[in-house]
């Protein structure tokens, strides 16, 4: 089977990619995520962040992509801007943002282990999820939706929002920019037409 992703020596096939996207989509729905909701991802490009991005799109929700290099104040402002109730946070960055996130009981913070898909998970320091806060582990998140039926794919609509990214803020505060499914499809077509695999 063709390889879809490579990450620190781990190779993930297209079949595994689709299976993981479907699993994450079921878990998102089990936490009440619906079409049009904004789900924040603050992570590097790990396989799990990719699964989450496509699972969010499958439901018809919008991925709010946040740089881990933001200050805690910038992060909370971007989350509030789109009323995101669910945050997927890479474990390496949670200590930096913890104080800004744990005070809001309405939000759920899913802790994504950055080395989860590689053998390095056995030797890397593990973030300890605080059971007394709004944090949950990636493993718990996946278990929450495991028994659900597969999520239906939200049908295509022209210019349907898929992701929100942010400008650099060189002349002031960074601004949210909503990207449509069409913009991502055009990018994929450009790669295909250039012979890039």
Region locations from a protein language model:
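N-lobe entry segment of adenylate-forming
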Residues: 1-31, 35, 59, 116-132, ...
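Conserved ATP-dependent adenylate/AMP-binding module captured primarily in the ANL superfamily
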Residues: 70-101, 187-197
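Conserved pre-ATP/AMP-binding loop-to-beta segment of ANL
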Residues: 129-166, 173, 196-197
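Conserved structural elements of the adenylate-forming
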Residues: 18-23, 146, 177-197
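Conserved AMP-binding A3 loop
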Residues: 13-15, 162-188
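Conserved AMP-binding/adenylate-forming
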Residues: 7-12, 25-70, 82
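Short beta-strand elements of ligand-binding domains
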Residues: 43, 66-67, 107-115
